[in-house]
Each structure stands twice: as structure tokens, then as C-alpha cells.
């Protein structure tokens, strides 16, 4: 007699055609809806996290991914954000290697990750929800929800996308492990959870979710193979030892992960500003408590009705709750009451199914009855046991593939789904809620990406329940479908339009003016200034200061607007106010110093300001890279000032100080400092040290021709090393054949050797490479004059005049060549034009005197 073998339930059960269609439809919907993000650029935080991040561009070693935060700042730095996401930064680095700084590749990866996440949400819903329509509703809602726009359209949201994918995969892997306690699935779960942690720290809660899922799992399923082999003791028993082992491993892994993150890795002493999280700086305990209790409600409100969305919810975007009579406290009470009700209902259903799940007992016992009764197993169907639970025919399909309409199947699904749906909503959000510890923001839409999985599961659970309750009325089901279609349509349109806001910074900042005016207007003013729209920028920045007079960035940006319009007297007070409000703002010192220089009579004050800015340590500054860049430029400006005043020793000292004070400076900028120091030392005739500094510059930037040119110029000052100097000029040309300055400086060297014909060829090549460069065009004319090719020289001098018609020396040079050619009248006109532009122009006066022409003579 043949006895059928019992099949073990598996998460890899074959999907039905309807499931495959729903899965493909949800993923396709997610892809199509975000297609309009593929032509977007780098906006807002993308610039700092990608464009200015040396960990992404390869400017730093790969090992630095483990030592630096998400923004490229060392974790030990006082200004570090503390966000450690090496896998996400690694993905950006791979994007850079594949396509450089072309944004299309970055956006495509984000869209594909969202499609994968939608796919996985569908599969997760399929393990929890009793109705296929509920699963479809959950997957479709996740695909179109507008709250996901920041995570998908904003490139820094990749941390949330990738962590969500790993989080859901870890959950699905552990569901498989729960069926038969295989070690492979458990190890895979742990690896996926740790990968999620390496994408974003909040995803470590995946291990908590897996443990909760195990605790809520029904009894009896994993031992069905023993029953099939005739072990009656496995009928209702559950192997608590194996479950305890799995839970212990999860707990140990969670503790190890937390220990490694909090103890082994550096923890920055970051002090978030009041603008980032004003409630955290509130002195009143009750205001802090009531506001932080309300923030999860506000976040849930975005999930419920995502009409008002903003790139930033800091400052006063969410006003603090200062009294018990604030109406928002009612919403807070209702929200937490609803959570308790869901958990209470779930625990009640759980109790009703304990200690024995009779549907599971039936599925386990009927194969045993078949062995006892042979082929007459059907005679056992419909029997009722002593506990009055009727036995039914067994199903050998995976529970994850069944959408049963029986009351027991519904009860089993309803037992876990509300609790696990709530867990998906709450657990990943807790670390960012400000309830456990303060974080550097009030609200952030991309933080909701993973918690929204729980929201979509609960929505799908409710929709599926309604769908099953009206199964006898096609009109009611049609109304449900219309309602679902309307909701998805409204969300889809909102998502599509919100994607357009994320295409460029101007539109993004304009979209948030009504929610966070000072932040949005301040950033918008900076964008308008960069576009050269100075009047709009000034108006916008003054509106910003009307909302928040103590905003240092707004004062600084307003100063930049005045500076770009050459209105230095108005720019200086703005920079001074920015420094007063934020003393560590090095770039404000830099701009203040350059503005003072431009006024002409404040050189000593400018030197003092630049020296102060260059020596700022920048304790607690958020953007360490920008701070170091500003200090570096302050040192360079300081050396230029000293050099122009003839204080070469002071200039060299400033550059030496910069090399010691800025150890984190990128190699390219360190090379510039060595190069400048070498030039100054050469002027001081310290040849050996000058040569040493220039060799250091070449070692740091071997692909930069400028270092070779400067080294060649230094060697050329030594008459015994002319051949060696020329070899370095030739190397520079080989390295950068399209660099005009390489040809220009080599030509200078050849002219010093009176090799004028060779020099002319290089002059012509340099001028062809930079046809709008006045100096290079003038040098061609000079080279032709030295070869006595005066007619050709005249043409080049005339071209130079067209490039700089307001430059007195350009007209004087043209006058000189005309004078040499005997064109006296035209030459005098050129000299007069030069004197008109610069009344004290010495060369024009001298040449007119040689021609016996008075200044106002008109021949």
C-alpha cells in the first residue's frame, strides 16, 4: 500500500498566475511612476553626500568608508553627523566608477531599489494577509505613496531604500527558517540584517521584528514531518528548544551589532543646533514631552494624507506644544490609543488560538489518519474531536500561498497581521522618533520609507477584511475597487508632481516656502544668487531675515549677493553679522577679507581677518570639507597679500603653517600649497628648498602639468640646468597637450634663450587653445614683433584690443606697433585712447613725447 509523503511547507511555494500578475503590476507601477526622476540632477543634500564627498569620488582610500560618516566626515570629528552607512556610500562610489558625476545612473539605481522594495512588500503581505486583494492593495499603495518621493527622488534616500530591501529580505528569510529551523536561512537572516545596519542604523530593528514574528508563530507546523513518520508525540507539541535557540541567536546578534556600533566605532560628540531640532533645546520638560509624543502622530499624518511635503521640517515647521489645552494633544491620545487597541485585539486573537491551533492539528493529524486507515482516509473527514473542533482535509501547499476563506484560516492570519503590521510601522521608526534619544532633525520624510511598509500592511489587512465581508455583493466590491482606484490615482498624481519638485533645487525650495519659510527662502536665495539673479536673491534673503533675523547663513548669502555686484561696502556688514552669529563660519572670514581687499585701503584689517579665518579649528561645524576648503583659501589669500607687499618670508610662513594645520586637505590642494611655497622660495633664492617643495607637488599630483612647468621655471634660473629645465617643460606638454599655459610658459623659456621661431609656434598654439584669452593673444603679437613681422603683429594687437577694449595697455601696445610701422596718426589716436582710459599711463605719455605730440593734439 502506497502512503503519500507529507510535504513540508516552504516559503518558495510556486506563485499563482494571479499572484505573479499582481507582483509584476505593483513593481511596474512603481517604475513607471518614478520615470520622471531619471532626468533630475543633484539637489540639496546630494551635493554634500556625493559631489563633495571624497569617499565617493575615490579621493580617499576605500578603508575610509569604515572610518567616516555618510557625509565623508571622520566619525571622530566633533562635527560628524554620526550616521555610519558604509554600504550606501560604497554604492555611490560604484556609481561614480561606472558613470562619473552623471546623475542618471544614480537615479536609476534608486528607482530600481524602489521597485525591488515594492516587490518584497508584496511578498511580505502575502505571508501575513488572508486576502489576495488585501495583498494587492498593500503592494500598490507602497508603490505609489507620495511620502516615498524624498527617498526615491533624493539620492541620499538610497540609505533608506537599500536598508528597506535588506530589512524585508531578512524578514522573509527568517520566515523560511521558522518552517524547519534550517541553519542556512538563519545565517542568511543575520547577514541581511547586518547589511541593513550597514545601509542605515535604524534597520538593526529587523532582528527584533524577526524575533517577534517567531514568538507570534502558530504551534505545530515545523514538526509535521515527525507526525508523518508516525510519531504521535509531535501532534501538538512545538520544539521550544529550537525556537529558543533561534531567538537566542537573534538576541546575541542584536547585542553584538549594537555593541560594535556604539562601542567599537567612534562616537562623535555631535551637538545638533537649535535650528535642526528646536524641541530638543527646549528648557521646559512638559513642552519637550508633549511635542515629542506628538511627532509620531505628525509623521503618521503624512502617511495618511501626504499633501504637505517638505525637504526640511526643522526650525519652526512643527510648532511646539506648550500647553495641555493644545488640540493636538487629542490627536496624540487617539493615536496611541489606536495602537494599544490594535495590539490588544491581536493579543486577544492570539489567546483565542492558544494553546493549540486546531487547524494546524488537523493538517498534521490527517496524514497520520491516512496511514492508519489506508485509502479510506475520506471516512475520517467531518469527524469532530472531543474538543468539538471539526477535522478537515489537509492542504499540502505552503500557508504563504493560500488565501483561505475558512474561519480558522482567517483567524490565524488576523492573529499575526495586526501585530506584525504595527511592528513594521513602529520598530524602524523608534530610533528616529526622539523618544529614545535626541536626533538631529524634527521630521524627515525619507525616514518614513521603511515604517510605511507597516502602514501599507495594515491598510491591506483592512481592505482585505472589507473585501471578504462583502463577497456576496458585487456592487459593494465594485465600490471598494473604485475607492481603491481613486486613492491610488490621487496618490499617484501627487507622487508624479512631487517628483518634479525634486528635479532642481529652485523648484524644491519654492515648494516648501509655506511649510518652512526661513529654511526654504534662505536656500532659494543662495540658488538665485548662483544663477546671477541678484535682485531676486536679495529680496528672497531679506524675506528670510524677516522670518529669522538670527540666521547666519542668510546674512552670509546676502553678503555674497552684494559682493558679486561689487557692492563691497554693503557686503562687509553682512559678513560681520554672519561671523557674530556663527564664529566658526570660516567662509565668512574669507569673504570678509576679500571684500576688505577690494575696498583698497583695508589691507591690514584684511590680513587680520584672513589669519583668524585660516586658524579656525571649526569645533562642531557640520560640513568639515567646506570648512577645510575655506581655511585653505584663507591661507592662499594671505600668502598672496604678503607676496604683493613684498613680505616673502611671511608668505612662506603662512603656506608652511597651512600644510601643518590642514592634514585632511585633499592631495590636489596640498600640491597647490607646495607649488606656491616653491615659487616663493625661488624668489627668495632658496633654490634647494624650492626644488624640494616642487618635487613634493609633483609627487602628490603627478598628472598635473602645472607642477612640471613651475619646476622647469625654477631650474631655468640656474644657467647650468637649462637642458634639464626644458625636459620638464616638454613633460608638461606631453601630460597636458591641450593646456594653454603649458605652451605659454614653454614659449617664455624659449624666448629667454632667444629661440624666437620655436617660441612663436608655441604662442600660436596657446592662442588657438584659448582664443578669448587677452594675454595669450598679446603674446603672439609680441612674438611676431620680435621677429619683425610687424603687419602680422598689428593684426594680433587689434584682436587683443577687441578682447579688452577698456584696458589702456591694450591700446598703448597697438599704438606702439602702428608707430613702428609709420602710421603716425593712428598711433597717436591709440595713445590718446589709452590716456582717456588711464590718464596717468606712462608708456603712452612717453611715446607721445617722443613723437612731439601734446596730449590734446589732434592731427
Curated annotation (Swiss-Prot):
GO terms for cellular component: endoplasmic reticulum membrane. InterPro entries: TMTC_DUF1736 (IPR013618), TMTC_O-mannosyltransferase (IPR052384), TPR-like_helical_dom_sf (IPR011990), TPR_2 (IPR013105), TPR_rpt (IPR019734). Its main location: membrane. One of its GO terms (biological process) is protein O-linked mannosylation. It catalyses: a di-trans,poly-cis-dolichyl beta-D-mannosyl phosphate + L-seryl-[protein] = 3-O-(alpha-D-mannosyl)-L-seryl-[protein] + a di-trans,poly-cis-dolichyl phosphate + H(+); a di-trans,poly-cis-dolichyl beta-D-mannosyl phosphate + L-threonyl-[protein] = 3-O-(alpha-D-mannosyl)-L-threonyl-[protein] + a di-trans,poly-cis-dolichyl phosphate + H(+). TPR repeats lie at residues 518-551, 552-585, 586-620, 632-665, 671-704, 705-739, 740-773, 774-807, 808-841. Residues 1-22, 125-134, 175-189, 267-288, 350-422, 468-473 are cytoplasmic. It is a multi-pass membrane protein. Glycans are attached at residues 567, 718. It holds the Pfam family TPR_2. Residues 44-103, 211-245, 310-328, 444-446, 494-859 are extracellular. Gene3D superfamilies: Tetratricopeptide repeat domain. Belongs to the TMTC family. Transfers mannosyl residues to the hydroxyl group of serine or threonine residues. This is Protein O-mannosyl-transferase Tmtc1. The lineage of its organism: Eukaryota, Metazoa, Ecdysozoa, Arthropoda, Hexapoda.
